[in-house]
Structure formats: structure tokens, C-alpha cells
Amino acid sequence: MAHLINFFKSKFSREKYENELEMVKNEDNPKRLSYIARHNVFPKVRLEAVSRISDESVLADIAKNDSNKNVRRAAIEKISDVSVLTDISRNDSNSSVRVMANNRLMDLGYE
């Protein structure tokens, strides 16, 4: 019985993920994209939302606060604010995120 429950639970989650990912790909409203990027439970959905956001303040918030390092890294790639990147390069809990922020600073001509 437990296997059957897990099967349906897994199928529901997969369908929910696929629906939400498709929704983000078709979303044009910056406020909705910002909300999705900050609050969706699926990291890949948040990644897709981040890829469609250009507001640096939203990206900075995500780069500093998202629970998933890959989402933070995606936001960093789009940030040009030196103070935000410096803060992340010094303080992020993940070394690969710190390195990426430092590399982004170098790409922008800061060392």
C-alpha cells in the first residue's frame, strides 16, 4: 500500500513541476516572475524564472537568499552591482557561489 501511495505522490509532484515550469516559460509579468523566483518549491522552476528577470534588486535578493546554490549562481551571472557581488564573494555559505561572485567581479573589471 505504501508503494502505491508513493507512486501517486511522485506522479503528482512530477506533473506539478512540469506544469509550473511550463507556466514560467509563458509568463511575461515581472512581478509574477519575481514571486515565482523567490517562492516556488522547485529549484528548476526558480532557475527558469531567474533567467527571465532583469531587475537587479530582485536578482540580488535571490543571489543572497535562495536556498539552492544553483539558483544563487544563476542570479549572480546577471548582476553587475559591485557591492552586491563583493558581499556575496565574502559571505556566501557555499564556496562555489563565492568563487562565482568573485569571477563576476573580475569579468566586470574589478579585482
What positions do the PLM features span?
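Alpha-helical scaffold segments
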Residues: 1-111
